[in-house]
Swiss-Prot record:
Keywords: Amidation, Cleavage on pair of basic residues, Hormone, Neuropeptide, Secreted, Signal. The lineage of its organism: Eukaryota, Metazoa, Chordata, Craniata, Vertebrata. The keyword Signal applies. This is Peptide YY. The gene is pyy. Its main location: secreted.
Length: 97
């Protein structure tokens, strides 16, 4: 006997999966440090500015690597992680007659 799912149950399951996936993106960035206010002590202000500088460095950090160029990303998507494919052309193979 086949089980038939109602359309609303599929929609509810899809929405729940989407919420779980979006929840993982929220945890990806560190929380912004709280401002201690105008009447805070100099030690608290220094601690806040250190935490703020660390937060800004984390958020604006540049990612360097072998896939930093758009061509590298496209070649990896099209050909996989095989670096030999980029180095050889199709005319390098010798034809055997």
């Amino acid at each position: 006997m086949a089980v038939v799912l109602k359309p609303w149950t599929v929609l509810v399951a899809l929405v729940l999966c989407l919420l779980v996936c979006l929840g993982t993106f929220v945890d990806a960035y560190p929380p912004k440090p709280e401002n201690p206010g105008e009447d805070a002590s100099p030690e608290e202000q220094a601690k806040y500015y250190t935490a703020l500088r660390h937060y800004i460095n984390l958020i604006t950090r540049q990612r360097y690597g072998k896939r930093s160029s758009p061509e590298g990303v496209m070649s990896e998507l099209l050909f996989g992680d095989n670096s030999e494919h980029n180095q050889r052309s199709r005319y390098d193979d010798s034809y055997m007659w």
